[in-house]
Regions:
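Aromatic/acidic polysaccharide-binding cleft in carbohydrate-active enzymes
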Residues: 119-264
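Substrate-binding cleft/loops of secretory-pathway carbohydrate-active enzymes
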Residues: 42-69, 122-138, 204
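Conserved small/polar residues in nucleotide/adenosyl-binding loops
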Residues: 317-323
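Active-site cleft segment of glycoside hydrolase catalytic domains centered on the general acid/base Glu
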Residues: 1-35, 41-43, 47-55, 76-91, ...
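Carbohydrate-binding surface patches
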Residues: 259-301, 307-310
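Flexible loop/turn segments at secondary-structure boundaries
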Residues: 2-6, 44-49, 74-80, 123-129, ...
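Generic, well-ordered alpha-helical scaffold segments in large soluble proteins
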Residues: 24-27, 31, 56, 60, ...
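Aromatic-lined carbohydrate-recognition surfaces of secreted/lumenal glycan-active proteins
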Residues: 25-48, 95, 99-123, 194-198
Length: 325
């Protein structure tokens, strides 16, 4: 891959990597025709050669692989809740870019094949702003992976040395950020077929020396797994909006501003087999509540069955073992 933090990152140029991926995928499928393979996209949306890298890669292996593997971790500075909860817009921009790129390659090859996407790493987090170094460009020599720090402490996987596993910013805020991303995946289910939540256990539970307990994300993801089935239905929302100014977390993670971000985020799934229309709604406004009116005139004969709500008076609250029911 192309990340300068990766050992051997420039051993293969994008064409060389694409050729290797093509030949490897062919051999694997000759051994087992049921195997599906994925080829890696660029390591970050902030790389100066994104998305040119994956364009060159796909030109070599489009016919033999099944997925373009993507990954991204959205970051927002402490206290900027709207930037954290608006992170799904950058994911959708990422998805639209890669899907369009895949379709361009298909058109150039006159191929009927439609490449699918897989998110093999994703997440959202609060990160303190780091010192910026103007003029050095992306991935400059101030980055930690170019330096040796003899005083850097190693992570000890020892119960008596266990680090704090609580989420920065609180369980509820972490859950809302992740669910907003997952709803974006649901809206793009025609192309995004796999999404691996990298910090799975870390996101779904918290722990201390003596206890492990379910965090807010556990309940939200459980409901998505149960109810986000069938056919993804596009939603149209009329609500108040806000603007997100651009910001830089560090020399690498720099986000353009976004205008007219809807305060209400939504996705829907029609479970035809069980005769259910399931609607998922999230409020990005930490200062106001909203009344929701749903127009489902296309589903005559359906009736309201039930709703689940996750709510807290304090978005920054962090749970402990005593909170789990």
């Amino acid at each position: 891959m192309d990340g300068p933090w990766q050992i051997g990152s420039w051993d293969k140029d994008p064409r060389g990597y694409g050729v290797l991926a093509n030949e490897t995928s062919k051999v694997m499928k000759w051994i087992d025709p049921t195997i599906e393979t994925a080829v890696c996209a660029s390591s970050a949306i902030f790389m100066d050669h994104y998305p040119e890298w994956e364009e060159t890669v796909l030109e070599q292996c489009y016919d033999s692989v099944d997925y373009l593997s993507m990954h991204h971790y959205h970051s927002a500075p402490p206290g900027d809740i709207k930037a954290l909860l608006g992170g799904s817009l950058y994911y959708e921009e990422f998805i639209d870019t890669e899907a369009a790129l895949c379709d361009v390659i298909a058109a150039k090859r006159r191929s009927p094949k439609k490449m699918m996407l897989s998110f093999d790493e994703y997440g959202a987090m609060i990160r303190p702003n780091a010192e910026l170094h103007p003029g050095y460009g992306v991935y400059n020599m101030t980055r930690a992976h170019y330096r040796f720090d003899p005083d850097r402490k190693y992570v000890l996987h020892d119960p008596d040395q266990m680090p704090d596993r609580k989420h920065p910013g609180g369980d509820m805020l972490q859950m809302l950020a992740m669910v907003s991303i997952q709803m974006a995946f649901l809206r793009h289910a025609d192309r995004v077929k796999i999404a691996c939540m990298t910090g799975g256990l870390g996101a779904l539970c918290s722990s201390d020396h003596d206890h492990v307990w379910r965090s807010a994300s556990y309940y939200a993801l459980s409901q998505l797994m149960e109810y986000a089935k069938g056919t993804s239905m596009q939603t149209s929302v009329e609500c108040e909006t806000y603007d997100m100014p651009g910001y830089a977390i560090d020399d690498t993670s720099q986000y353009r501003g976004k205008e007219n971000v809807p305060y209400v985020d939504s996705a829907s799934a029609w479970d035809r087999e069980n005769g259910r229309l399931n609607l998922f709604v999230l409020n990005r406004n930490e200062e106001s509540e909203y009344s929701l009116t749903v127009d489902v005139r296309g589903f005559e004969g359906y009736r309201f069955v039930k709703q689940f709500e996750m709510y807290t008076d304090c978005l920054l609250y962090t749970s402990d073992a005593a909170d789990e029911p």
